[in-house]
């Protein structure tokens, strides 16, 4: 019998490494919406704890969350509007967000498109008074004139060009005369859509006129003071305490002992 290693013998296995739950190394942060909206508690997000050169705040800044206007303003009729919010600052365990865009849900857009009518779209780059460069998309549909017998409501190319020009003028006027906060306040009740519908009555009657999308192309440099103004100017509840300044006490040397 040959003496040597028996390959059939099972090799003793070492102790298995204990699985660690990755969530034990993460912290949860609250997401706060600006004061444009009624319900400011958007939700929560998590991030790895600060460790070494990796700071948790740096990982959170720049995150983009999406919320329905039905949840933000507690109005189910506005569920087709989606608002994007970007995390621009951290205060304690709270993420302070700012407006980053608006869009319609796909089912709402599909419900607007129908036969026998013309769809008119326009987009315009505008700048607010506080330095935000926005791209605003407007959509509209033609409707029947009073006492019209004809089935379709197709607009001529000249009508479409004239309506689109009115859209450009109104969007430019409404955006250039206000800051971002006031512009968002105009988006929610559809002020721009009503202005376009009123201004184009003499060209061709319109219906379902909406600002369907807004993109933030360029934002000014981050400023914590301006961000706090958007959030009401006060410190967010739950933030870390700033601390108390230590008293300036001078050191006094103790008197020497007579004997030890």
Swiss-Prot record:
SMART domains per the UniProt record, alphabetical: Ribosomal_S3Ae (SM01397)
PROSITE patterns from the UniProt entry: RIBOSOMAL_S3AE (PS01191)
GO molecular function: structural constituent of ribosome
UniProt keyword annotations, A-Z: Acetylation, Cytoplasm, Ribonucleoprotein, Ribosomal protein
GO cellular component, one term: cytosolic small ribosomal subunit
Protein's cellular compartments: Cytoplasm
Major localization listed first in the record, in broad terms: cytoplasm
Keyword field contains Cell division: no
Residues recorded with modification N-acetylalanine: 2
PANTHER family: 40S RIBOSOMAL PROTEIN S3A
Known partners and oligomeric status: Component of the small ribosomal subunit. Mature ribosomes consist of a small (40S) and a large (60S) subunit. The 40S subunit contains about 33 different proteins and 1 molecule of RNA (18S). The 60S subunit contains about 49 different proteins and 3 molecules of RNA (25S, 5.8S and 5S).
Family membership: Belongs to the eukaryotic ribosomal protein eS1 family.
Protein name as catalogued: Small ribosomal subunit protein eS1
Organism: Mycosarcoma maydis (Corn smut fungus)
Primary gene name: RPS1
